[in-house]
Amino acid sequence: AALVQGGRERGLILHKLIEEVLTGEVTEAEAALIERAADLIRSLGRSPVADPATGLSADELAACVARTLALPDIAALRPGLLAEFPVYAAQATDGVETATAGIADALTVGKDGRPVVVVDWKSDVNPDAQTLDHYRAQVRAYLDMTGAERGLIVLMTSGTVMLVLATKSTEGEAI
């Protein structure tokens, strides 16, 4: 595998690119993905480079998104996968209400309109164990907030998909 320079800008572009594919703003055709990735690189005031080890490569970014969308776990969810979904929760503890808000990168909903699977795209090149634990906790919080059954942490660069299950059962809960 080619060396890839990670970083915040790469993550922003990958998230935006995959969001635009899911919303239909950009097609999955390779040329369209490359062109849009190059536009996004330039919008950050950078110039696209050929070698992803030295900067932001439109070809590498487009290929990463295409590979991610083709992963079996993601391909199976694609027909109902919604991008950038706000999640909220309020919890009262000892008379103090705490509100939590976030944005799930993508999720699916069941026939009843309730979230089923929460997907979190991660662009890290080689995350360490502590980072992965943080990601699991983040997705578990989204599961608890939404009542979704399971979450997927998708490490886009490596193509690894990690399953996260909710901490509490959502079966039979009163609505």
Where are these regions (language model features)?
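Nucleic-acid nuclease catalytic cores
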Residues: 98-103, 108-169
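Compositionally biased non-globular segments, especially hydrophobic aliphatic-rich helices
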Residues: 40, 169-173
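Acidic, low-complexity intrinsically disordered tails
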Residues: 1, 5, 152, 162, ...
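A non-catalytic, helix-rich entry segment at domain boundaries
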Residues: 1-96, 159
